[in-house]
Amino acid sequence: MPAQSLLQAIAVGDRILLDTSVLIAYLDGDEASHPVARYVVDDLVASGRNPGVVSMVSVMEILIRPMRMTPEGHHTVLGFLRSQPYLDLVPIDIQVAQDAAHLRAMQRFSAPDALVVGTGLATQVRHLVTNDLAWQSKLADMTARISVVRLADHLPFPART
């Protein structure tokens, strides 16, 4: 079963943060990791198997391309995000800012990445789902608290018809 490695990495009920790269891959069928992202969003999060969290930084980032394409292009993306009952869109608050500042100071994350990861820490997710190679090494000392699951590590993944 192609999804087996993903199912082993993310246990039933574990809360997961979806990074911007996951959402972009989900929305863009031409992305190499689209089949994995689609499985994570449609089969794990949308089903309720794994509640998902998305930072407002990621929301902002995934709205840029649709806004550039057409004036109302982002409404489809917003509608999708708002229609997901098991997906929490998390605003940046003082705890997220504090966690992000720590990540910037100690692991030298970029400000956007620090805010995204900080959202995951503040909301106590078990896994950060991303396609960012650097996150695993930067967060290596935090594996007891949080793990990094990279989409690319689960390729090849068959596309759905």
Predicted feature locations:
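Short acidic, glycine/proline-enriched helix-loop-strand junctions
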Residues: 77-99, 104-112, 135-161
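Acidic, PIN/NYN-like endoribonuclease modules and their adjacent C-terminal/linker elements
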Residues: 1-13, 117, 122-161
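Alpha-helix capping/helix-boundary segments
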Residues: 22-23, 58, 96, 115-116, ...
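Short, well-structured N-terminal submotif of metal-dependent ribonuclease cores
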Residues: 1-54, 68-76, 151-161
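Short active-site oxyanion
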Residues: 48-52, 86-88, 124-127
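Short beta-strand scaffold positions
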Residues: 18, 53-54, 91, 111, ...
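Histidine/lysine/aspartate-rich catalytic loop segments that bind and position anionic ligands
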Residues: 58, 67, 84
